């Protein structure tokens, strides 16, 4: 047998594939479909893959997924769901500043550790006030103090059990006649740790645990519902106060400074400067303003697609960069403006430059499949921002409608005339607020129902983990290290190779990306259990 056919222990492995540097040195603009990653060696199970990654210089996520600041993608419901699953949502700004700030406030109030600014009432408030608060805030466990303010002496608490069976004729009854009195409450002393307080709350079997000082004055409160959320969502993205992380987008004009102030009052964690072309004097000026007024606030700059664009924003002090121009499914910037760059090349070029300064990169746009997420991360992105992939989920804004028997939701680009007509924030993003003739850089369309984020995101997480497993990377930091060291190998795909890599040779087929009748229980990381028959994105196709 010829020597080159003899196997076993030779130590010889021929060179195969291209490094990322070689792949992008060719000069062609590459999209995610234009290349593949060659497989590596597997010595771990997919559940062991650590998806922790940096959103900004100071904020880390356990899941590298972000929902886009689009008015058909992210408001409070989406942001809450994304944060619970370990990612983060960025509230869009195609609305009034007050509406946007209130959406951020809803996210921050959804889950908390020590609640230091709860709704508080006095004994003179009425049962009707509690019902009104329940409608406004979604809960009715309200502490009662002498003055109706924090820092005042605790005299009781009113819960749904106290008022559930009261009728409208009782709405004028003062709370001192309906509340659970102070002597019947379980409380914890000021200075108690969150773990100790949670233990007391569990033993008490109560819904709320007031925290009081030596003078019996209310200083904080914790809620049983938050305990359950901690159990069900161990990956949840939280700040130092145990509130869910939330981001918001703003523009780069003078009136956006007022919007910024309202968002800061609402507790926003990260600001995304929303511009189709981020390398501008407007954005640099806004970065300088924010860093002077709110030096600890994390700021994401963009969008950029070249190292030269990135340099100016990094020099101005951004904490992360958003990469992508004209690559979204509803974006036509490349066609209309002749400006942009294929997303694969954009991510690699900007990430390779920004990493030298410790600035994480967000791959924004062009994500059609979970494989595209893996490719973006393998090219150096720390996180991935998604629009169309999350559109038409239960948590996305808008109402479902039917067309030809298919359940759909509206999805539109922020550069569409549709979005521009709703609010001038969208116009500012494309520098067109003063134009007599508006030039659309996006389109409006519809997307098929994907079901809930709580079922769809676990599918994305599992897909990313399996992709990293096939590559041989046990974490995203290892994945990036393999790419920059040249250990990770790529290969360009011809059009024929792309056809071969997809479904082919069938008359018709059904595509169901994740389990329909089972779902991933939050925190189980890969163990399906029986669940309700919630619609999943299924596609039946026929070959022509």
From Swiss-Prot:
Mycophenolic acid (MPA) is a non-competitive inhibitor that prevents formation of the closed enzyme conformation by binding to the same site as the amobile flap. In contrast, mizoribine monophosphate (MZP) is a competitive inhibitor that induces the closed conformation. MPA is a potent inhibitor of mammalian IMPDHs but a poor inhibitor of the bacterial enzymes. MZP is a more potent inhibitor of bacterial IMPDH. It catalyses: IMP + NAD(+) + H2O = XMP + NADH + H(+). Its EC number is 1.1.1.205. Keywords: CBS domain, Cytoplasm, GMP biosynthesis, Metal-binding, NAD, Nucleus, Oxidoreductase, Potassium, Purine biosynthesis, Repeat. CDD domains: CBS_pair_IMPDH (cd04601), IMPDH (cd00381). GO terms for cellular component: cytoplasm; nucleus. HAMAP family: IMPDH (MF_01964). SUPFAM superfamilies: Inosine monophosphate dehydrogenase (IMPDH). GO terms for molecular function: IMP dehydrogenase activity; metal ion binding; nucleotide binding. It is an enzyme of class 1 (oxidoreductase). The keyword Magnesium does not apply. Belongs to the IMPDH/GMPR family. IMP binds at residues 329, 364-366, 387-388, 411-415, 441. GO terms for biological process: 'de novo' GMP biosynthetic process; developmental pigmentation; eye development; GTP biosynthetic process. Pathway: Purine metabolism; XMP biosynthesis via de novo pathway; XMP from IMP: step 1/1. It is found in: Cytoplasm; Nucleus. Signal peptide: none annotated. The active site is at residues 331, 429. NAD(+) binds at residues 274-276, 324-326. K(+) binds at residues 326, 328, 331, 500-502. NCBIfam families: IMP_dehydrog (TIGR01302). InterPro entries: Aldolase_TIM (IPR013785), CBS_dom (IPR000644), IMP_DH (IPR005990), IMP_DH/GMP_Rdtase_CS (IPR015875), IMP_DH_GMPRt (IPR001093). PROSITE patterns: CBS (PS51371), IMP_DH_GMP_RED (PS00487). This is Inosine-5'-monophosphate dehydrogenase 1a. Its cofactor is K(+). Catalyzes the conversion of inosine 5'-phosphate (IMP) to xanthosine 5'-phosphate (XMP), the first committed and rate-limiting step in the de novo synthesis of guanine nucleotides, and therefore plays an important role in the regulation of cell growth.
